[in-house]
């Protein structure tokens, strides 16, 4: 696809954990990148980057963002402030879709959603055919945006990605357990150790977003992104694997509760949630020929090596 027309891409959320890897990969592949940002950012060292300073709800700015673009990556989202989630995740997506409908050059649109849209589930394996029942505001707004994308009638290839728990060296997330190894974290390991971690490195999410740009998608496709086919992608499995990189090679001897116990604890406090034994299937990804460039072990090794350098 990138060989047949001008390499101009547009991206929202370019400063986020996934967006910045997409920008890096596009630049490395020789693309010109136009990004939307609420604040002026210094990209003076990247002549192929242009910044459009505006909010996601600014219709004129979005049309400027998309002008001449062949590929669009929508990564912008509000993850923390519930009072802004509808405005950003739903209304912002609606504005972007309106801009896409009047932009004739776009051939590929990638929407970054979340595996969390599946909501509470007891299913052992979750795939793209499972029904979604989002339970919190973030999940609901991301799923509503998904449905808007699916029903917008876009005349282009559309890919919806649902990453699990995204991490990298700057935002290690669950990997903080073996990094800090405090009493508090050991208690968490005891309680949640046998639950799925659903980790996915941001670099592998970006790789998937660019991979499907080069596939001929006959219809809108949805993909879960998680290393869950690797049996070590549990809270305790990640802890053991990360600790195994140390030259000290100290044995990791600990006991973790069955995954049903933390589920019951969450249910008593917050109601139904995703059961800790759930795994997100990689079967559909593989059927399209995509293999994670990093995978679980290599992605954790990246974090480990970066922390070693810092220390």
Describe the predicted segments one by one.
Residues 9-29:
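N-terminal Rossmann NAD(P)H-binding glycine-rich loop of SDR-like oxidoreductase domains
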């Amino acid at each position: 696809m990138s060989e047949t027309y001008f390499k101009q891409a547009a991206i929202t959320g370019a400063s986020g954990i996934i967006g910045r890897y997409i920008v890096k990969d596009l630049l490395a592949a020789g693309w010109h990148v136009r990004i939307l940002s609420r604040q002026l950012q210094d990209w003076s060292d990247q002549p192929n980057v242009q910044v459009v300073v505006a909010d996601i709800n600014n219709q004129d700015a979005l049309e400027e963002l998309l002008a001449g673009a062949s590929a669009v990556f929508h990564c912008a989202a509000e993850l923390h402030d519930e009072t802004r989630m509808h405005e950003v995740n739903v209304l912002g997506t609606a504005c972007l879709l309106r801009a896409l409908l009047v932009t004739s050059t776009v051939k590929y649109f990638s929407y970054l959603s979340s595996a969390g849209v599946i909501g509470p589930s007891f299913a052992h394996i979750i795939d793209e055919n499972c029904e979604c029942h989002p339970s919190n505001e973030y999940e609901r707004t991301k799923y509503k945006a998904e449905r808007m994308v699916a029903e917008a009638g876009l005349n282009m290839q559309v890919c919806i990605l649902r990453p699990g728990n995204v991490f990298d060296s700057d935002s290690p997330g669950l990997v903080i357990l073996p990094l800090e190894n405090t009493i508090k974290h050991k208690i968490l390991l005891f309680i949640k150790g046998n639950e799925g971690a659903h980790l996915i490195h941001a670099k592998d999410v970006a790789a998937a977003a660019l991979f499907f740009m080069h596939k001929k998608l006959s219809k809108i496709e949805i993909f879960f992104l998680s290393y869950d086919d690797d049996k070590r992608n549990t809270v305790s499995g990640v802890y053991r694997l990360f600790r195994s990189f140390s030259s000290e090679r100290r044995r990791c001897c600990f006991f973790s509760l069955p995954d049903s116990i933390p589920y019951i604890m969450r249910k008593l406090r917050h109601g139904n949630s995703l059961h800790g034994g759930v795994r997100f299937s990689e079967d559909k990804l593989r059927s399209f020929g995509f293999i994670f460039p990093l995978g679980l072990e290599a992605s954790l090794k990246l974090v480990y090596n970066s922390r070693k350098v810092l220390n």
